[in-house]
Amino acid sequence: MNTAPFKLEADFASALPTMAAPWQGEEAPNPELVILNDDLAYSLGLDPTWLRTPEGVQFLLGLNPEPLTKAVAQAYSGHQFGQFVASLGDGRALLLGEARSADGVLHDIHLKGSGRTQFSRGADGRAVLGPVLREYIISEAMHALGVPTTRSLAVISTGRKIQRGSVAPGAVLVRVATSLIRVGSFQYSNISGGIELSQHLANYTITRHFPSLVAELSAPTPATYVSLFKAILQRQADTVGKWTRLGFVHGALNTDNTLISGETVDYGPCAFMERYRGDAKFSSIDTYGRYKFENQPMILGWNMARLVETLLPLLGATPDEGMTAAQEALVEFDDLCEQAIRKEFATALGLDESDTGTVEQFRELLYLHNPDITTLLRALTDNTAPPSGFEAFVHDWKTQDPDIEAMRAVNPLFIPRNHLVEAALADAVEGNLEKFHELLAAVTNPFDPTAGPDELRLPSEEGFEEDYMTFCGT
């Protein structure tokens, strides 16, 4: 056997065994590595050469015990479209363990589509190639755009044919996160283990994500957990600020899809708008627009309220003190989101974040004229003609001496536009990955004009977005 040159840790499984069910991936009849993210593998101390061996592919499927310590399915609850489900968990996923990057940070190595677990609730636990490649390309694009996100390490085709409306090739996604601790993780700890387990999970979260609070864990006080909650709020606000600047619609902001780290997770029904509008939604199952673009800050606030409900006994010496502390922190979330959004747009416009007047004027024009935000911001960056309705704004904006070099670093030329992603995936599931690799090269170097052909910069044809719909699909 080709021995693995690394071994994963089992940090989560060891620290929180009641939230981790030991499990193993499903055997694949004819596994084949479709794509491997070499740079990400190197950064995590994982040898790409070994990962390409048969033993490496088995490891990526959760089957080779050599580099594994204790693969587990994680337990969590969740509000899905506002409805609480007490036991969700990894129904088709596995945490293989954690890899430690050169800076000492632990990263979850996590499978999606690895087969049934005890949380599958009757589903087959599998995933199909198109949606798996979709998550790969969009998550890596988001990383390149500077958005906190889970990342994609590999895609493996399983050789299995999966029934999803039509027959599709089976696949497994190997994704990476600084952790997959969710709001739903705290909801599960609260109902299954009460405040003792919730405090244990909170302490573990601090060690994984908030090192400035670690020193307080030797003798934690209510202030420790208030600080934790405030830090989580800030991370959510920072992320939604970036989504808002980029015109990104997540589409499934359930509490089980809201990571404590602030990283974006679950790219099934997401989309990038090409007409900037508050009512934009693309998910086929978001019938009433709960997760439409303009609702994202509000929904994250709602999710944060569900989180703090699980922490109330930790936030004060008495129930009243805990409730007061929670309310005082939570009431600030709207302002945190607004500050983050204004900061993002100020940076995109090359202005100081204190210039709120210009930023607000720009935002008003976005909702009035519904431009393609990517094209518009690059037009400003490159001093080309802006779309109709922005002429007067641009004239005034230029008088403020915007920092054009700073703008070049944040305003992309390439994003994973919906029509381009769909075309690449349609070819990929038929075995032709040429368009996929071409688009991946462009969107992972989004500020480099030489990263892809000019047609990858262009919006879709008129009318495409009006009919475009996304599906979880996996």
UniProtKB/Swiss-Prot annotation:
Q: Where does Mg(2+) bind?
A: N257, D266
Return any one Pfam family short name.
SelO
Coiled-coil annotated spans: none
Gene Ontology molecular function, alphabetical: AMPylase activity; ATP binding; magnesium ion binding
State the source organism's domain of life: Bacteria
InterPro entries this protein is in? SelO
Assigned EC number: 2.7.7.-, 2.7.7.108
Top-level EC class:
transferase
Where along this sequence does the record place binding of ATP? G89, G91, R92, K112, D124, G125, R175, R182, D266
| The keyword Signal appears for this protein | no
> What is catalyzed by this enzyme?
L-seryl-[protein] + ATP = 3-O-(5'-adenylyl)-L-seryl-[protein] + diphosphate; L-threonyl-[protein] + ATP = 3-O-(5'-adenylyl)-L-threonyl-[protein] + diphosphate; L-tyrosyl-[protein] + ATP = O-(5'-adenylyl)-L-tyrosyl-[protein] + diphosphate; L-histidyl-[protein] + UTP = N(tele)-(5'-uridylyl)-L-histidyl-[protein] + diphosphate
> Which keywords does the record carry?
ATP-binding, Magnesium, Manganese, Metal-binding, Nucleotide-binding, Nucleotidyltransferase, Transferase
List the cofactors.
Answer: Mg(2+); Mn(2+)
Catalytic residues at D256
Family recorded in the similarity comment: Belongs to the SELO family.
User: What is the role of the protein in this entry?
Assistant: Nucleotidyltransferase involved in the post-translational modification of proteins. It can catalyze the addition of adenosine monophosphate (AMP) or uridine monophosphate (UMP) to a protein, resulting in modifications known as AMPylation and UMPylation.
Name of this protein = Protein nucleotidyltransferase YdiU
- Name the gene behind this protein: ydiU
